[in-house]
Amino acid sequence: DQAIQKFFVGDGQKLYDAITDNGGGQEDAMSDNKAIVPLDVSKIKNWKNLISEYNEGNVAANTIRNRKGEIVGVPYISNADSMAYNKSKVGGDIDTWDALFDSQFKGYAAMQNDSGPTLTTTAVYLKESGKQDIVNPSDMSKSEVKGVCQFLIDMKKKGQFRTFWDGFGNGVDLLASEEVLVSSCWEPIAVIAAKKGADIHYGTMKEGHQTWNNVWMLTKGGKQRGQEDNFYKLMDLYLSPWFGARTLANLGFTPQMTGVNEYVDANPSDFDANTKAVIAQRLKNKSDRMAVKGNSWQNLYPKELRAYQ
């Protein structure tokens, strides 16, 4: 892992005061190796705005805490990754991952070229549809990983996938050009592809989704250099409705703070009626996705990581 190598073998501690990465394992690895330090959240005035999912015992609580229970991360974006689809071309809305593997879209389907999200998403589908016995899609056994991989290999051999997209721009281009009609992808890819003119929608899959977040962490080197107070000031920005409203409206990321609707209503010059409607619909869609029981949180370090790789 590049982040780990940079801080434990390279010169990361000298170069960086803060680091951002996925919550769901990275915060533990960085904390175990003393690359980051516990946070004094009383110095982050907007911490009170943090959504309840991060309260102790709730679904995302562990993604900002180390194994000792200390808070070491500040979340600033999150999402439940789903499927983008070209509604006018496929003939309606889609609410199941089954479409990604349906022969009617043979040669027009795409997935991410990344073993983590692609294997987890496929595992969620196979588990919830009863096609494979899987205990935890985010932490599969070797045999479970093998079964998921074999399913994808069989699909690839049949010509189901147009490609496996690499990077944000590639994901956007495939949808915007209509070279691909259904794709597992990040929501911002669907948002930008739609802005380019294609009838791209982002669905809620009845089987579930891979959920994730990104968190900011204060490095040991940053604290030693006296940057702790500056870090907390920056975190206030990331936990402000100003930031949450804009990342939601422009990219589709889930705000990590309360008060976004109130902020939007109080700033009509920044958010016209159409933008307000988009924000309201996206918030509803996100609530619907997060309510699906088959959701599985991203795990950067499954026990059988080598099998995934």
What are these regions (language model features)?
Residues 37-49, 73, 198-210, 221-222:
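Short beta-strand->loop
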Residues 14-21, 164, 181-186, 201-202:
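Paired acidic/hydrophobic, glycine-rich loop segments that form the ligand-binding mouth/hinge
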